[in-house]
Each structure stands twice: as structure tokens, then as C-alpha cells.
Design a protein with these regions (language model features):
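Sec/Tat signal peptide C-region and signal peptidase I cleavage site
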Residues: 15-20
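Extracytoplasmic small-molecule ligand-binding "clamshell" domains
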Residues: 21-89
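An extracytoplasmic/periplasmic, membrane-proximal ligand-sensing/linker region
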Residues: 21-30, 34-45, 241-302
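A bilobed periplasmic-binding-protein/Venus flytrap-type ligand-binding module shared by bacterial periplasmic
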Residues: 31-32, 115-126, 230-248
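Hydrophobic residues within well-ordered alpha-helices
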Residues: 73-74, 132, 184-185
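A conserved helix-loop-strand patch within extracytoplasmic ligand-binding domains
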Residues: 104-160, 164
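Pocket-lining segment of extracytoplasmic ligand-binding domains
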Residues: 138, 142-246
Length: 302
């Protein structure tokens, strides 16, 4: 792992400006998906560790939607974020020199994939996509990989049109993963999608992901919902660092994050949205397919 980590750091050094200025603060962007208070609480330990490691004030930013973090990274107002694969693709396609992927969250078996999970209320009688005919389907955010991009490709490929009124009565955005879960529970939509590693027990919300976080938080009792669809494996999104950061800052943050699980497993649990084996090196190459899918999706919508 140390050799791979060194290679990642060396690669990021090649794309960084030669004369980066010293930083006076460090800013970590948190993607939407759950309420801002819970996002801040889950990442406060990491913020404190970062502030100690860098010796400068460190702030967490909770954007209202995915695009807020995407634009913050592109515009240089954010220094670090854990992105979904589609959100990383959005950053890369707008400015390929803005950030570099350095690490990825791994599952307990060492893999770094997860799934888009379709679900409905257990008392709805819906047990599969077939049962969603003439029903309302909720999706989290147009920049979410599991909350929109992958379902947009895989659900039509399985024979179910995503055009509102053709199979589903309507296809709507809820604003985020947690919002989708709440919308299904409240009956605002008949079914929805969110993300999970797909490992472990359903009644726990799997081992990690939004179902696990929402179950831990008491937002959902997993006995009240059922799985109605599951995507093929999706590459877990990368932790990225802004390329314009000084090299010593990028090195410190990569090493801090890579060692977080060993140093403080409970903190890593909160940051990783559940059980994790830790954070391992990753490069841009892991996301080439997702970038191609996003380009194709944008071409179709234009």
C-alpha cells in the first residue's frame, strides 16, 4: 500500500502548480444526501484531526446539493471532498485540472464498489419494478451516481422507460438520498433509490451507505421498507484534493485520511457512512467508464 500511496502522491505532484501559496485555512466540502446537522456531526472528528495536522483553521461546508460542492472544487473555494463517481466526472469534464482523486473508501471485504438500491414501503405491495407501473419514482440528485446516473442507464436497459408517464407515472427529484428515504416513508413517492454497499444484513441497512446511516439515526426501520431493485456494482467515488494546494498539504491530508481507520475506527465509521476496511489509493482511471456514461447522458439530453 505504501508504494501505491507514494505513486498517487507523485502523480498528483505532476499536475499541481509549481508555486502553490501557503494556506491560511482548509475547507472540506460535504455532498448532500442527509441533513446538514448530521453531515457536520459525522465529519467533525475528521475536521478536528485535519486542523491539528495542518495547523490552520479547518471548516466543513454542507452544500444544499451536489452541484454546490462540484462548483466549490472547480472554483477553488473548497480544498477536499468525498465525491460520488458521477460528481467527480462532472468536475473533471468542466475542469480536468481542478482536482485529483487520491483515495477511495473500501468495504469490509476490501472491494470499493456499491449499489444503487431501489426500495418501497413494505406495506405498499410493491416488491419489484414491475409493481411500479403507474407509480411515482423518486431520485436524489441529478449529479448523484447511484441516485440518478446509474438508474437512468440500467432501469431502461431492463425494459422500464424513465420518461414520466410511459411506465412510471412520474419521475421526480427529492433533493438527496435521505430525502428520498423520507419521501418513500411519507408516501410522497411510491418508490425511490439510494445507495448501499450491498454487504451485510438488510435489517441493518447493509454495512454502509445511506440506508445504514438512516437506520443508525432512527430515520427508518428497515422492516418498514423492502428492496425492489439493485444495480450492478458501481465504483465508489473518490476522495479528491484540489490540485493547487501545496504539496505538503496534499501529502498530509492523503496520509491522514489513509490512516484514519487505524487511528480512530469510530471516526472512520462516521466519515465512511458505516462499516469500512479503510481508505485505499485510487486514480482517475477507475472512473473513466462513469465519465463516458455521463458524457453520453449529456449528449442525449442536449
Amino acid at each position: 500500500m505504501k508504494k501505491i500511496l507514494a505513486a498517487v502522491l507523485a502523480t498528483s505532484a505532476l499536475v499541481a502548480p509549481a508555486a502553490a501559496q501557503e494556506i491560511t485555512e482548509f475547507r472540506i466540502g460535504l455532498l448532500g444526501g442527509e441533513n446538514a446537522q448530521d453531515r457536520l456531526a459525522s465529519n467533525e472528528c475528521f475536521r478536528a484531526y485535519t486542523e491539528e495536522a495542518l495547523g490552520v483553521p479547518t471548516k466543513l461546508f454542507t452544500a444544499a446539493d451536489y452541484n454546490g460542492v462540484i462548483q466549490g472544487l472547480i472554483g477553488g473555494t473548497l480544498d477536499m471532498a468525498w465525491l460520488g463517481a458521477s460528481a467527480y466526472a462532472a468536475v473533471y469534464l468542466e475542469n480536468p485540472d481542478a482536482v485529483t482523486p487520491v483515495l477511495v473508501k473500501t468495504n469490509l471485504d476490501g472491494s470499493f464498489t456499491y449499489h444503487s438500491i431501489g426500495f418501497a414501503r413494505a406495506d405498499s405491495g410493491i416488491t419489484s419494478l414491475d409493481d411500479m407501473k403507474d407509480k411515482t419514482f423518486g431520485f436524489g440528485d441529478p449529479n448523484s451516481t447511484s441516485g440518478y446516473l446509474v438508474p437512468l442507464v440500467e432501469i431502461p436497459a431492463a425494459g422500464y422507460s424513465m420518461e414520466p408517464g410511459e411506465f412510471f407515472s412520474d419521475v421526480v427529484f427529492t433533493g438527496g438520498h435521505e430525502q428520498t428515504i423520507i419521501a418513500v416513508l411519507n408516501g410522497d413517492v411510491d418508490g425511490g433509490v439510494t445507495w448501499a454497499d450491498g454487504q451485510g444484513a438488510w435489517e441493518d441497512g447493509y454495512n454502509s451507505g445511506q440506508l445504514r446511516k438512516s437506520s443508525d439515526a432512527g430515520i427508518v426501520d428497515m422492516n418498514d421498507i423492502v428492496e425492489i431493485w439493485k444495480s450492478s456494482p458501481i465504483p465508489e467515488g473518490p476522495i479528491v484534493l484540489r490540485n493547487a494546494l501545496p504539496e505538503d498539504v496534499k501529502t498530509k491530508m492523503t496520509e491522514l485520511t489513509a490512516g484514519l481507520h487505524d487511528m480512530d475506527p469510530q471516526c472512520a465509521y462516521g466519515v465512511a457512512a458505516g462499516e469500512t476496511a479503510g481508505f485505499e489509493p485510487v486514480t482517475h482511471d477507475a472512473y473513466k467508464t462513469i465519465i463516458e456514461v455521463r458524457v453520453a447522458q449529456q449528449s442525449q439530453s442536449n
